[in-house]
Swiss-Prot record:
Catalytic activity: AMP + diphosphate = 5-phospho-alpha-D-ribose 1-diphosphate + adenine
Underlying gene: apt
Cellular localization per UniProt: Cytoplasm
GO biological process: adenine salvage; AMP salvage; purine ribonucleoside salvage
Enzyme class: transferase
Xref: InterPro entries: Ade_phspho_trans (IPR005764), Adenine_PRTase (IPR050120), PRibTrfase_dom (IPR000836), PRTase-like (IPR029057)
Any GO molecular function: adenine phosphoribosyltransferase activity
Catalytic activity, EC: 2.4.2.7
Name used for this protein in its record: Adenine phosphoribosyltransferase
Entry keywords, A to Z: Cytoplasm, Glycosyltransferase, Purine salvage, Transferase
UniProt cross-references to CDD domains, sorted A to Z: PRTases_typeI (cd06223)
Subunit note: Homodimer.
Length: 176
């Protein structure tokens, strides 16, 4: 996937000391304010993944939904939601994860993932890789196969790709 940092950087707000001191938060919600930019993002991802063998798209709460939901419609694929603990009403698989700034637990409905389905996993940002690694483990435990991972932004200096070794990881925006 081509590096599009130069184009998208102007539309990504950088918020220092959020959610806690010492963290620089990359806010992609400003991309949503420009429909032409948001459309461009979805079209870029669609163009890259459209011809790959993908059976469903799984998205990480909550900003992963912003990319995955329109993409699943465009690709005519089922959308599987990965949520924070306690937000799903049916039987779930759960997995612990570590964030850049804390810990948490994610869940997926046990019956949302088809056995042996090829999954494109999407989140907005790749930092430590902890959330995505836990999401991939969760989906695989539910019977799926995570074939590809896409993140809009990748913080290369943190090197989250290291713990995602074995997965095909792509991003459009890369910051050192």
């Amino acid at each position: 996937m081509k590096n599009k940092t130069e184009y998208y950087d102007q539309f990504i707000a950088k918020v220092p000391n959020f959610p806690k001191k010492g963290i620089l938060f990359y806010d992609i919600t400003s991309v949503l304010l420009k429909p032409e930019v948001y459309t461009s993002l979805i079209n870029e991802v669609y163009s890259f993944y459209n011809l790959k063998k993908i059976d469903c798209i799984a998205v990480v709460e909550s900003r992963g939904y912003l990319i995955g939901a329109p993409l699943s419609l465009k690709m005519q694929l089922p959308l599987v939601l990965i949520r924070k603990e306690g937000k799903l009403p049916r039987e779930v698989f759960g997995e612990e994860y570590e964030l850049e700034y804390g810990f948490g637990r994610i869940e997926v409905h046990k019956d949302d993932v088809r056995m042996y389905s090829n999954i494109l996993l999407i989140d907005d940002i790749l930092a430590t890789g902890g959330t995505l690694k836990s999401s991939a483990i969760l989906l695989e435990r539910a019977g799926g196969r995570v074939k590809n991972i896409f993140c809009f932004i990748e913080l290369c200096g943190i090197n989250g790709r290291r713990i995602l070794e074995g997965y095909k990881v792509n991003s459009l925006v890369r910051y050192d």
